[in-house]
From Swiss-Prot:
Required co-factors: Zn(2+)
EC number: 6.1.1.3
Subcellular location: Cytoplasm
Organism of derivation: Chromobacterium violaceum (strain ATCC 12472 / DSM 30191 / JCM 1249 / CCUG 213 / NBRC 12614 / NCIMB 9131 / NCTC 9757 / MK)
NCBIfam families: thrS (TIGR00418)
Biological role: Catalyzes the attachment of threonine to tRNA(Thr) in a two-step reaction: L-threonine is first activated by ATP to form Thr-AMP and then transferred to the acceptor end of tRNA(Thr). Also edits incorrectly charged L-seryl-tRNA(Thr).
Family: Belongs to the class-II aminoacyl-tRNA synthetase family.
Protein name per UniProt: Threonine--tRNA ligase
Native organism taxonomy: Bacteria, Pseudomonadati, Pseudomonadota, Betaproteobacteria, Neisseriales
UniProt-listed GO biological process terms: threonyl-tRNA aminoacylation
Amino acid sequence: MPDIRLPDGSVRSFDKPVTVHEVAASIGAGLARAALAGRVDGQLVDTSYLIDRNADLAIVTDKDADGLSVIRHSTAHLLAYAVKELFPEAQVTIGPEIENGFYYDFAYKRPFTPEDLAAIEKKMAELAKKDIPVERYELPRDEAIAYFKSIGEAYKAEIIESIPQGEVLSLYREGEFTDLCRGPHVPSTGKLKVFKLMKVAGAYWRGDSKNEMLQRVYGTAWAKKEDLDAYLYMLEEAEKRDHRKLGVQLDLFHLQDEAPGMVFWHPKGWQLWQNVEQYMRAKLNHEGYKEVRTPMMMDANLWERSGHAANYRENMFITESEKRDYAVKPMNCPGHVQIFNSGLRSYRDLPLRYAEFGSCHRNEPSGALHGIMRVRGFVQDDGHIFCTEDQINQEAKDFHRLVMEVYDRFGFDKVAIKLALRPEKRIGEESTWDKAEEGMREALRACGVEWEELPGEGAFYGPKIEYHIKDALGRSWQCGTLQLDFMLPERLDAEYVADDNSRKRPVMLHRAALGSLERFLGILIENHAGAFPLWLAPVQMVVMNITEAQAEYAAEIAKELEKQGFRVELDLRNEKIGYKIREHSLQKLPYQIIVGDKEKADGLVAVRARGEDLGQLTLEAFAARLKAEMPEA
């Protein structure tokens, strides 16, 4: 009879098989009411799951991440139930949990309207209030196909037909609605109390544009109302900070149909870019990197030898000239190996660090493009370190220090570190992967940091350390990477002369602190809501006159500040000063300098700092304030 070990180490013995719910009830009535699912020997299961052996069990409630996952998945089914109640002719397809919520795809004769969405959400609330039991049962594959065909659910039947013969499938029934699902689900609809439908979008069946267009209803679900309110507030703030809107409002960049996934940078936007790039260039120079430049296009044969053609071809732009195939580079690494290979290298040259603000192009699907965050043409702050195995840990430590200093400079103080391990599609021997992954773990230990491991998410040629920064809205963005690669030096025949005069392969470390500069600038725009710190702002201040009488004095002030190295705009338009102040406030400039007759007579400037009136200052005092505000180089 089963002995059940709980997370605190205590063991409960039962004289017959017992469900997860019954174990929870034996601990306390409160826990039984709160139980949403269980984790039996690491596997997430329903509360109705019968345990007939000795096992480890954790009861899952809405306080656990697993609990929230179960709530969201179950709410997707509640959505489908409500749609079938209101629109019986609609056919259901798939409805998974996603980040912060869920979606469900439906086939219906007409698009769902905002009024439909409100009615569906109301029906979901009614069904939840009824606290209808959610029951799991199993059917053989062929019976499941016959069942779904009998109720007119052709899409579900098609899904099951792709499952091998002889499989037994799990179905979930709540009231009049039954769905195919692995589960687990909440024990009853009454556990689903906090949800909201967000929007409807189109989605092709099975993600194939040749198939029919379905309607995807997105929703969000939470354990507590205050969590939902906080999420909706975050979305509202995110909309205000949307880099696509601010990019136009602040005259930084624009996008247009003639160049999908490519960015047109305006003067202010390009100044912002240069502020970031020049800071990174100085940082890399200080760290001993040698800046290089590699061709935009190289013979397809090189990409075949590197492994990119076999593992990345669908993302590459291919062209032809004089009967030779060329690929526009999606990455900089093979080019850096060519520079390494251009001369005889000695162990005394290592570590050799190359850096490139390399322009890359990737053939991203048009549906995946998003402002400047997801583009087809982008620049990476790329770098490659050629070193010996003995040098890996020190190089990793040095890069870790560098990347943390960079994030601190840009105002990101919350950084999570993750280790992405071998993907399903990869090159190289398993023993090489074992060595590379353990090498990355050793490097992280040497840095003295904690990390999370992500199985299956490494690059096709090696594992990678990922740096995830958290922005002002609490959103996480993966930016920096450090990848350990034994494969590419082998495939492209890179070697150096060792201290015993033998030829050896270098280890290659791929590294980037920011990743795509376009994406990082998008993150910066949204993080600061366009109100950049002084050092980063494309225009740091504007000098405005009140009347024509102060125009010459205003121009002198602007010229003197420019001479001291500041980025200054001069606004001498014949407009009311209130109008000029409001207009420049929308541009989110760090400082506005106003000069009238009094300032001109006294040799002063009136200063506003993003709405805060700093009063009248001498130009020397104001310049000293500016210099004190600028970070050290």
